């Protein structure tokens, strides 16, 4: 791998990690669902000025936006609000990879390889260890942990929608898909914030 590619990969890792720190800081200033809604508001509208709507069925675009954008981040922001450590949340959220493998096998009939089964087994053991730590009071709130897992599952569902979208005849550009899908969760976030966070 070229040095440039390694540096770009490292930049992505750093940006991903800082994302959780920023969420943690932001939650000190405003409720989780409102913060998440504003995040997508700031992403969506500038993007709409530069990219056309992807030519895919609206049901797929809605499914993608409501899972990978709304579901994932609604649960994640609430998890951190309820005490889930930001660093641990970034790790637990990666359970999406194993949820994606399982969903892919069930929906697309993808065959599970031995190394994937071993990975899933190790992930389950890791989850059980974290649950045990939560139950014994080692500063891992059970509610925050379960909400993070729910976020990971929604991310996995979004991956399934993404695969269906990319199999469509008019395969959209990634930037168009990300930009327009960011528009979808704004209203759900604001409505849920009004209901759960209060006016």
Region annotations inferred by a language model:
Residues 8-9, 61-65, 90, 120, ...:
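Residue-level signature of transmembrane alpha-helical cores of multipass secondary-active transporters
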Residues 34-44, 77-111, 116-120:
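Specific alpha-helical transmembrane segments that line the substrate/conduction pathway
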Residues 13, 65-70, 94, 148-156, ...:
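Residue-level hotspots within the lipid-embedded alpha helices of multi-pass solute transporters
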Residues 44-47, 100-101, 106, 137-198:
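Transmembrane alpha-helical segments that form core, pore/gating elements
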Residues 18, 22-25, 29, 42-57, ...:
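Membrane-interface helix-cap regions at the ends of transmembrane helices
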Residues 41, 47, 64, 102-103, ...:
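Hydrophobic transmembrane alpha-helices of multi-pass small-molecule transport proteins
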Residues 56-60, 90-93, 109-129, 138-145:
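Loop-to-transmembrane alpha-helix entry segments
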């Amino acid at each position: 791998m070229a040095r440039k590619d390694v540096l770009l990969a490292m930049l992505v890792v750093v940006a991903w990690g800082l994302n959780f720190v920023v969420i943690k800081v932001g939650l000190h200033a405003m409720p989780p669902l409102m913060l998440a809604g504003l995040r997508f508001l700031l992403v969506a509208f500038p993007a709409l000025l530069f990219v056309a709507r992807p030519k895919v069925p609206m049901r797929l675009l809605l499914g993608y936006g409501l899972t990978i954008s709304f579901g994932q981040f609604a649960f994640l922001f609430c998890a951190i609000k309820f005490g889930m450590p930001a660093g641990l949340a970034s790790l637990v959220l990666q359970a999406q990879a194993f949820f994606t493998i399982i969903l892919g096998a069930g929906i697309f009939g993808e065959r599970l390889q031995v190394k994937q089964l071993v990975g899933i087994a190790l992930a389950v053991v890791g989850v059980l260890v974290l649950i045990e730590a939560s139950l014994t009071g080692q500063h891992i709130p059970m509610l925050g942990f379960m909400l993070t897992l729910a976020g990971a599952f929604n991310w996995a569902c979004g991956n399934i929608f993404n695969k269906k979208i990319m199999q469509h005849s008019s395969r959209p550009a990634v930037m168009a898909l990300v930009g327009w899908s960011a528009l979808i969760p704004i209203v759900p976030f604001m409505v849920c914030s009004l209901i759960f966070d209060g006016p």
